[in-house]
Amino acid sequence: MSKLKITNARRKQRVRLSLRRIANGRPRLSVFRSSKHIYAQVIDDLKGETLASASSLEKAMRDAGNTGADIDAAKAVGKLVAERAVKNGVKEVVFDRGGYLYHGRVKALADAARESGLSF
């Protein structure tokens, strides 16, 4: 394994461990970003269920013109996943950045989710 992959894997483990410690039964808002798209889902780890999800691949995003993995798409995904989570009765979550730095697309998604009603 390359040094970069090891560093990223360790960061991801460290983030997940700290999330488990502070979660207190709250679901987590998990973010995955690729070079072409961005994905977010609200996961209840106690039940093992996904409560809400959104990605830049969805038809609603394509119709609005927010495709790809830029900051505008991340904002739209954050807003959409927050609206779906609030609709399912989830108000408080723990933000799981998944080892990614809290900057750029990840930060834009988090800010949009906060503005749309999720608190973390």
Swiss-Prot record:
**A molecular-function term among this protein's GO annotations:** 5S rRNA binding
This protein's GO cellular component annotations are: cytosolic large ribosomal subunit
Instruction: Give the Pfam families listed for this entry.
Output: Ribosomal_L18p
User: Is Acetylation included in the keywords of this UniProt record?
Assistant: no
Q: Gene3D superfamilies given for it?
A: 3.30.420.100
The record's similarity note reads: Belongs to the universal ribosomal protein uL18 family.
Q: What is the purpose of this protein? A: This is one of the proteins that bind and probably mediate the attachment of the 5S RNA into the large ribosomal subunit, where it forms part of the central protuberance.
Tell me which NCBIfam families the record gives. L18_bact
**Summary of subunit composition and partner proteins:** Part of the 50S ribosomal subunit; part of the 5S rRNA/L5/L18/L25 subcomplex. Contacts the 5S and 23S rRNAs.
Query: Under what name is this protein listed?
Result: Large ribosomal subunit protein uL18
Source organism per entry reads: Nitrobacter winogradskyi (strain ATCC 25391 / DSM 10237 / CIP 104748 / NCIMB 11846 / Nb-255)
